[in-house]
Regions:
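Signature of N6-adenine DNA methyltransferases within the class I
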Residues: 3-209
Length: 210
């Protein structure tokens, strides 16, 4: 504690924060404390987003934090606050998106790596890398150096990490006049079972009762 207080925080934090949906937390008082103490809190969000914010607050002014976590925050509505948090702080140094590449054999989660600091950058761009396949550990640094591109993210849109050709195409599509008035369409979540374990079963279970 003395060293922590003397330095004003940690020099480096490396973490794999827990993934847990906030809406599953039944303790209302605990949930209210989270809402009152975290800027990126969203009632439909996930605890890992709060861990990212907390990690930054535990750093000293020159500290760096690196986290491997879910990549859902890049595009989901509950990730809006976290994305804007990064943009306002201008502290996101590097972002790696593994898409559907299986990183953990024991966990079914699409992952990303976040590297950030408490110091503001001199640019609005973020160094980004997209992985579509598993590569050898020895080739990781080389792959990142060869395939990273600088992306300027918008506070109003989901974040897409792709190659320059794809990003340029997306920009062109955004600039096409909206003749169909698509902004009037409201797309919401589809039907929910309410209890997946009861309604989504393997083929073996129906055979037992037939």
């Amino acid at each position: 504690n003395e060293v922590f207080e003397k330095k004003g925080g940690f020099d480096v934090i490396v973490s794999n924060p827990p993934y847990y949906q906030i809406q599953k937390i039944k303790d209302k008082l605990y949930k209210k404390k989270l809402k009152d103490n975290f800027e990126v809190f969203d009632s439909f969000g996930d605890l890992y987003c709060l861990f990212i914010e907390r990690s930054l607050k535990l750093l000293n002014e020159n500290g760096v934090v690196s986290l491997i976590t879910s990549n859902k925050w890049l595009k989901t509505s509950y990730g809006d606050k976290l994305r804007n948090y990064f943009l306002s702080k201008k502290n996101l140094l590097q972002l790696i998106d593994f898409k559907k590449t299986p990183i953990f054999k024991s966990a079914d989660v699409d992952t990303s790596i976040v590297l950030c600091t408490n110091q503001k950058k001199n640019t609005d761009d973020t160094k980004c890398t997209l992985f579509n396949t598993i590569i050898e550990h020895n080739d990781l640094e080389k792959f990142i150096n060869l395939n990273s591109i600088d992306i300027k993210f918008s506070p109003n849109d989901p974040w897409t990490i792709a190659n320059k050709v794809t990003l340029n195409l997306l920009d062109k599509l955004k600039n096409i006049p909206n003749k169909l008035n698509l902004e009037k369409l409201i797309i919401k979540r589809g039907l929910l079972t309410g209890l997946n374990k009861a309604f989504i079963v393997s083929q073996d279970i129906p055979r037992v009762f037939t």
